[in-house]
Amino acid sequence: MPDRLVPATLAFRDDGTLVSPAYGDIYHSAAGAIAQANHVFVAGNGLPARWQQRRTFTIVETGFGTGCNFLATWAAWRDDPARCERLHFVSVEKHPFSREDLRRAAAHIVANTTISASVDALADAWPPLVPGLHRLEFDAGRVVLTLVFGDALERLPTLVARADAFYLDGFAPSKNADLWSIDVFRALARMADEHATFATYSSSGVVKRALDEAGFAYRKVDGFAGKRAMLVGEYAPRWRMRRHEPPRAWPNAAARRALVIGAGVAGCAVVERLAARGWNVTLIERHERIASEASGNPAGVFHPLMTRDDNVASRLTRAGFLYALARWRALEAGGHAFARSTHGMVHLAESADDFARMRDAFDALGAPSDYARLLDTDAARAYLNLPVAHGGLLFPHGGAVWPAALADAQCAAAGDRVQRLTRTEVARLERNGDEWHALDAHGRTLAQAPVVVLANAGDAVRLAGLRHVALQPVRGQLTLLPAASASPPPCPAIGDGYAVPLDDGTLLIGATFEPDDVDPAIRVAGHAENLERVRRLLPGLIGDVPALDTLRGRVAFRWVAGDRLPLIGPLADEAQAVANARALSGAKARDLPRMPGLYGAFGYGSRGLVWAALGAELIASQLDGEPWPIERELAEAVDPARFLIRALRARQVSAAD
């Protein structure tokens, strides 16, 4: 079952101080929230001096609240000419405010200050109140806020980050004991960089004992606004306390050069995310144009999954869906707009039992209306202005996207940092010193770089020489109906099949799902199958249709893994793992040897639009040693090495293989 979020209640004391009715405590001192944030957390962690001349600086906070600590830190960073290149701020919040309550609370706190504009930017970017990680970017991506909605006790151990500073904030230990427990401090210690600092308003004995036990050295300093003392200090364990160190930047990341092989939505998303961090990327595509294979379809549908148990696929599609929306809005704001629908998308149930499952999933998540709405049969009929057999889910921000236009926009955003090599086929990869060489069929070097990201779908397995990854091709044929043959719905609708209205009045319907069929020819039987599906889904949508052999269509191939999850991240050194199979029989993902600088972003199946941006951000974060945009469990669920790990654990691999 998902952890339903309970939003914070906006309430004030008579003196104007913001208070939490649930905890019976104030959010900040009556002497001023921003002044308190600057004294306790910014200065308490030796900032801004400690981030100066750094490429990246990461702060982890235990309670976001009104965001005043983030706003104060952002202002200090902006005012510092020697600031770090990228500031990461990771903050956990069990009871986030709604967007409008956050705007009111933060505006009240920063009234009559220069931070007011930042409040609007924060509120405008505020995500729907659903569990998980939400990555927001400000100041052209140089300030990155990762909000972690959920209980700190449960969420902190799932985070992957190397923290330079900790803001230990939250209601008093007597009011919220869980947030100050030893388990929380141990989770923070696992993320601490050497000599990472911390600061906290509290100086209670409970906090001091937990700090000491987790390996933090503390000292008392003057508190804020007459408070006698607060605590500051650093991570200084007396002995080694962790099996795995928090992640660092990849050793050769300083070169900031990469090859991306495959120019569909997966590869172009990687290009954009690396270029945004200052990487120079060579994009290699075997076709004349980018987005020529599955990404060349006229449109693709875009929506999350919802399940009652909120399983890995649901959480991953939710994270990908929301992150993609944030990235696409940033592209549009930067002048790189592309074609996408804006009236939501309806996922119709296929039966009464299917609708009951949708209702259970919706109720379990407690989804807010800006994320999903449950429509009964009458409501779905009214929304689509068409007869329907069952209700479904409305995703207000779901819809359809033209993948090729998105890929173009991502490459345009990368600007001069991307060099395109089209009509270029990579026959094999070869490691020479610290660089990978992409070679043609004659052994000539096409391009070289320390990092390669394989985003070329089914061919990635061959190029990487992976023996423990099996991808299956799935043929998908779509059909284009002329405007006279249908009355297009106001938004895309999906179920067992889909119907997407295009701008020219054409109706896109599809698609067939034919595993292990690699026939590229359009078939009349495929058109007939698509028509039958959509007629069941939306009776009355389709009228008279021309002869099937005259209909236009397109065939593309989706590549899927056995568990239907993508493969994203560093590729395993399978030869070394096999040679050490016995020692690695109980291995975790972090124990496995990896191919230096070789990453994958493939196997997206029919969910490339949902997963591509998130996958690209994960790879870029891994390369640069930044906080990951998803929890470790989700990253391990998409790790390309997961099948090898399972084989090792089952002792199905030996050095003789």
Swiss-Prot record:
Claim: Metal-binding is one of the keywords in the record: no
Chief location category: cytoplasm
Compartments reported by the entry: Cytoplasm
Catalytic reaction annotation: 5-aminomethyl-2-thiouridine(34) in tRNA + S-adenosyl-L-methionine = 5-methylaminomethyl-2-thiouridine(34) in tRNA + S-adenosyl-L-homocysteine + H(+)
Pfam families reported in the protein's UniProt record: DAO, Methyltransf_30
GO biological process: methylation; tRNA wobble base modification
Keyword line: Cytoplasm, FAD, Flavoprotein, Methyltransferase, Multifunctional enzyme, Oxidoreductase, S-adenosyl-L-methionine, Transferase, tRNA processing
Stored Gene3D superfamilies: D-Amino Acid Oxidase, subunit A, domain 2, FAD/NAD(P)-binding domain, Vaccinia Virus protein VP39
Region (FAD-dependent cmnm(5)s(2)U34 oxidoreductase): 261-657
Cofactor annotation: FAD
GO MF assignments: flavin adenine dinucleotide binding; oxidoreductase activity, acting on the CH-NH group of donors; tRNA (5-methylaminomethyl-2-thiouridylate)(34)-methyltransferase activity
tRNA (mnm(5)s(2)U34)-methyltransferase, as annotated region: 1-236
Key word Flavoprotein present: yes
EC number in record: 2.1.1.61, 1.5.-.-
GO cellular component terms, semicolon-separated: cytoplasm
HAMAP family: MnmC
Family: In the N-terminal section; belongs to the methyltransferase superfamily. tRNA (mnm(5)s(2)U34)-methyltransferase family. In the C-terminal section; belongs to the DAO family.
PANTHER family: SARCOSINE DEHYDROGENASE-RELATED, TRNA 5-METHYLAMINOMETHYL-2-THIOURIDINE BIOSYNTHESIS BIFUNCTIONAL PROTEIN MNMC
Function, as annotated: Catalyzes the last two steps in the biosynthesis of 5-methylaminomethyl-2-thiouridine (mnm(5)s(2)U) at the wobble position (U34) in tRNA. Catalyzes the FAD-dependent demodification of cmnm(5)s(2)U34 to nm(5)s(2)U34, followed by the transfer of a methyl group from S-adenosyl-L-methionine to nm(5)s(2)U34, to form mnm(5)s(2)U34.
Protein name per Swiss-Prot or TrEMBL: tRNA 5-methylaminomethyl-2-thiouridine biosynthesis bifunctional protein MnmC
Primary gene name: mnmC
